[in-house]
Amino acid sequence: MADHARLISLPSSVQDFFNQISSIFKSIENFYLLYKTRLKIFLICTIALIVIVLVAKIIKYTLAFHACIKIYCKPLIKTTNCLLKLGKRKRRKKKRKGKSIRLKELSS
């Protein structure tokens, strides 16, 4: 039986190695238990910071896109507005001329 136990037992260097690994895992576990809330707060803050940066970039690019649209489309909008205004002015002038002729006819 003793010989059988000797065959199963590992050499001391291997046992020391496994003991060191288990102590490392225990220290990591203790560190996690001690700083669990701090780690959660840190993770929440980093995630919030990433979200804020992404939202800021999205807003920046959308504002830049709207600025480009305004810069390039403003002349087109101005010309269409001018044409619309000219068309309205012509119509108004025609209506006024007709009214003024009628008023002159009525007055005379």
Curated annotation (Swiss-Prot):
Keyword annotations: Membrane, Transmembrane, Transmembrane helix
Basic residues: compositionally biased ranges: 88-101
Region of interest (Disordered), residue spans: 88-108
Localisation: Membrane
Repeat as UniProt keyword: no
GO CC terms: membrane
Entry membrane topology: Single-pass membrane protein
Keyword Membrane: yes
Residue intervals passing through the bilayer: 39-59
Protein name: Protein alpha-1
Species this chain originates from: Adelaide River virus (ARV)
